[in-house]
Amino acid sequence: CIRDRNTTMNDIALASKKGRRTLYTYFKSKEDIYMAVVESELDMLSDMMKRVAEKNISPDEKMIEMIYTRLDAVKEVVFRNGTLRANFFRDIWRVEKVRKRFDAKEILLFKDVLREGVEKGVFRIDDIDMTAELVHYCVKGIEVPYIRGHIGAKLDDETRDKYVVNLVFGALHRT
């Protein structure tokens, strides 16, 4: 993978079917390429979440689907690339820097769905902005344990989902 110490820019050029000079035109180092890959993955995740937010389903269904879409997509990206997985856990602060734009987009999507839920009488919440940020940071906080399989590891999916739904909808005062 890109961040392997033995991987050279020449290896990356061969794998990407680009010339080494072409790579150096856009990237200064392997590290820059790695961060571009992380950013690209986050853009795809953002698009996936936007598609869920735009679905013609109830706001409560959207919230749960957005949460699972995010967690499952991050887990899939991390496991698809073993080095990315190792670096995700080891280099979290660097990844955090790249994630700022994604985080802002995600909070806006949560706000839109929460607002829709309030307008339709599905949720009773006082402060949509604060609630969207709290949902975002709660989901972000369980990301690593979810990826590592620590959340609901001894439960079947249906039971685990029931707990998640009860927690999320309890917090949003679903009517």
Model-derived features with residue positions:
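Active-site loops and adjacent core secondary-structure elements that bind or stabilize anionic groups
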Residues: 1
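Helix-turn-helix
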Residues: 4-32, 36
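Hydrophobic/aromatic residues within well-ordered alpha-helical segments
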Residues: 30, 37, 41, 45, ...
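Hydrophobic alpha-helical connector segments
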Residues: 36, 40, 50-76, 131-135, ...
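Secondary-structure edge/capping motif, primarily at the C-terminal ends of alpha-helices
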Residues: 52, 81-88, 146-150
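Short secondary-structure transition hinges
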Residues: 71-109, 119
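C-terminal peripheral helix-coil segments that are non-catalytic and often amphipathic
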Residues: 108-120, 133, 137-175
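Membrane-interface starts of transmembrane alpha-helices
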Residues: 124, 128-132
